């Protein structure tokens, strides 16, 4: 099971848009996740957003680079940025994404 959380223990049901970039030599990469109207921003949610947690059977990948975008004075979008600083981190992220994509009907397309 592969899930994304913003507060530990609370799964985010909204499936994000994800943009990936990677350095030409493959040594570093970045993933930017964009969640429109996520459950974590719902009025009834009282959980504090402490980061973005990507959790699967291998463990947890964490980033604290999480921002909210506001429209008409209300939070509407959560954008999270995960920086991978080695090929091992990139490979681990891609294994998570393969599991998450399979469970949520996502597909990978190269730009």
Swiss-Prot record:
Primary location recorded for the protein, binned into one broad class: membrane
GO terms of biological process kind: photosynthesis
InterPro entries noted in UniProt: Psb28_c1_sf, PSII_Psb28_class-1
Alphabetized PANTHER family for the sequence: PHOTOSYSTEM II REACTION CENTER PSB28 PROTEIN, CHLOROPLASTIC, PTHR34963
Family membership noted in the UniProt record: Belongs to the Psb28 family.
Quaternary structure annotation from Swiss-Prot or TrEMBL: Part of the photosystem II complex.
Protein known as: Photosystem II reaction center Psb28 protein
């Amino acid at each position: 099971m592969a899930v994304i959380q913003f507060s530990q223990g609370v799964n985010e049901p909204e499936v994000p848009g994800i943009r990936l970039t990677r350095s030409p030599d493959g040594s570093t990469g970045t993933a930017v996740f964009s969640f429109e109207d996520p459950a974590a921003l719902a009025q009834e949610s009282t959980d504090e957003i402490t980061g973005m947690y990507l959790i699967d059977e291998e463990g947890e990948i964490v980033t604290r680079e999480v921002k909210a975008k506001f429209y008409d004075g209300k939070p509407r979008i959560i954008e999270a940025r995960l920086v991978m600083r080695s090929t091992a981190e990139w490979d681990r992220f891609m294994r998570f994404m393969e599991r998450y994509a399979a469970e949520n009907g996502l597909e990978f397309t190269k730009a």
